Amino acid sequence: DHIGALPFVLDKIGEPDFYAAPLTKALLMKRLEEYKDRKPIDIMTIQPGEEVKISDKLSVKVLRINHSIPDDLEIIVKTPIGNVVHTSDFKFDDTPVNDKPADLLKLKSFGDKGVLLLLEDSTGAEEEGHSISEKTIKENLEIIFKQAEGRIIAATFGSLLNRVQQLITLSETYNRKVIIQGYTMKSNVEISKELGYIKAEKHTIIEPKDMHRYPDERITVIGTGAQGESNAFLMRYANGEHKEVQLKKDDTVIFSSSVVPGNERSVQALKDNLYKRGVHVFHYKMMDIHASGHGEREDLREMLRLLRPKFLMPTHGYFSMMARHAELGEEVLKMPKENIALAENGQVVEVTPDKIA
């Protein structure tokens, strides 16, 4: 979702250098193929721990951080007046999927050197506690796999590759073949397999046309549409409009995602339709089968303790989320209110060694 705007701003931002982690680069290049009229760009690969010198006075270092997709990077901008840290979307996860945990010692070392300004993800700032580990999600999904008697139909975000990997791994454990549905998900899985970010045995993933060769209890379908999108796989399946996957009453449907604000009605209508059709339905309110990629209040506290910034600027979230995040700056670091900037889209914030305004 964050890289999708690039084709639309390319003609407005001059000719900057582009850097991205390997998976991000591959997904971006695939995205840009859909916009043949946009000018071609060259994206340089950057790895966690590497630093790019922009000028004599400016450089950018990136560190590994965890999210719902591999290759997430925290960005540290080194300036003459101090370090500016942007967390990106993040959570702390000791047991991530096909990824390494964030290096807390490296984060602390930057805190020891001094951080002038921290821009931190606020999406989970209204939720108390730690974000759920992907390990917990896999354990709960396995409960469903153990008891499912027919096909498993699992829906999630097309970019939630960690969840796709868990579903593939569990399918292999329980001797199920996997069918991928949804253009974005198919593309993302293909790219991730090529780069080694999704691991599957040679004959695990099959084409929909081969599904009839296996009994229902040996089939898992992973697709898009958990937000109730009208043209996505899950809605067409629920309405009996999907050519390749027709609904059956012994199907088990898994919503492995939370509901994005604004989609509540369409998701509820979709769930109601599935219940009316007689399938078994599991969603995140019944058991922990979805973990947000965004840290909750305890994750945010931990980042603040590690980096100990002079100034805090909550980012990414509704204003209410950023306001709750600001409270943590006061609570954890005893930060005065004037050292916290609550800005809205379009506002310009000026930072000096002594103040933020």
Where are these regions (language model features)?
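C-terminal regulatory/interaction regions
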Residues: 169, 173, 192-357
